[in-house]
Regions:
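Conserved, structured core segments of small domains
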Residues: 1-115
Length: 115
């Protein structure tokens, strides 16, 4: 299954001094970017990148279990400083297959109402 991961810097994690900013970039941002690149090369991250104009990441991962999601997301150095949401994704064909029976029921109700 595929998941959309959205990570945004928590307000409490914002640097307040230039020295904190340097430390944050060196110890959290660069290592996270390097690890995301590696995970992309390993095809654990399927697509994604940094958010333009914001301090955040958005990417799609494939995982068979919640444990895999936790390993990837919590393994990112920047994770403790981020507000993170993980959304399960359904494929286009799976969604269409789920909707077909409901559509047929609606059609049956519509044709029955016109009698």
């Amino acid at each position: 299954m595929e998941y959309l991961v959205d990570m945004r810097l928590a307000d409490s994690a914002r640097s307040t001094t230039p020295a904190e900013g340097v430390t944050f970039i060196e110890q959290f941002i660069f290592p996270t970017l390097e690890l995301c690149q590696k995970l992309t090369e390993e095809q654990r991250i399927l697509a994604g990148g940094t958010l333009s104009g914001a301090i955040g990441l958005a990417f799609i991962i494939r995982a068979d279990a919640a444990k895999e999601i936790d390993e990837i997301v919590a393994g990112l150095p920047v994770w403790p400083r981020m507000v993170t949401s993980v959304t399960p994704l359904t494929t286009w064909s799976d969604r269409a297959a789920i909707l077909r029976p409901g559509l047929e029921r609606l059609r049956a109700q519509t044709s029955g109402a016109g009698r």
